[in-house]
């Protein structure tokens, strides 16, 4: 037969396990926000995309849209910047604007 202290101990273990799982799930589900952009406007004639998906960034960082391209930034608690939407058109690296003749011919 189980004693009362064994039952209390098992119940406490189950409660702690449930709270731990809930805490981990909350951290995984909560996709952080982008902080305020450091450079909202860009003086370059091209963009530099360091990320084209949220999976391109390390854990604890998000892919954010900035003036000079997409960059991985540390997550913020408040939505101040623009988060990159996975599946949007994006090209890694230096991206130059199309030249006038490229609109008519696919170069």
Curated annotation (Swiss-Prot):
Keyword Secreted: yes
Source species of the chain: Lycosa singoriensis
Subcellular location: Secreted
Main location: secreted
Tissue expression as described in the entry: Expressed by the venom gland.
Protein name: U20-lycotoxin-Ls1b
A GO biological-process term: defense response to bacterium
Function statement: Has antibacterial activity.
Any one GO CC term of the record: extracellular region
Disulfide bonds listed in the record: 34-64, 42-68, 51-63, 52-90, 57-72
WAP domain segment(s): 31-76
């Amino acid at each position: 037969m189980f004693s009362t202290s064994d039952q209390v101990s098992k119940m406490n273990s189950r409660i702690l396990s449930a709270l731990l799982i809930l805490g981990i799930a909350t951290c995984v589900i909560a996709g952080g926000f982008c902080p305020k952009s450091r450079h909202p406007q860009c003086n370059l004639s091209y963009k530099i995309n360091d990320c084209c998906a949220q999976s391109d960034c390390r854990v604890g960082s998000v892919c954010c849209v900035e003036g000079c391209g997409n960059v991985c930034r540390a997550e913020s608690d408040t939505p101040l910047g623009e988060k990159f939407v996975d599946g949007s058109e994006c090209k890694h690296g230096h991206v130059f604007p199309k030249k006038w003749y490229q609109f008519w011919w696919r170069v």
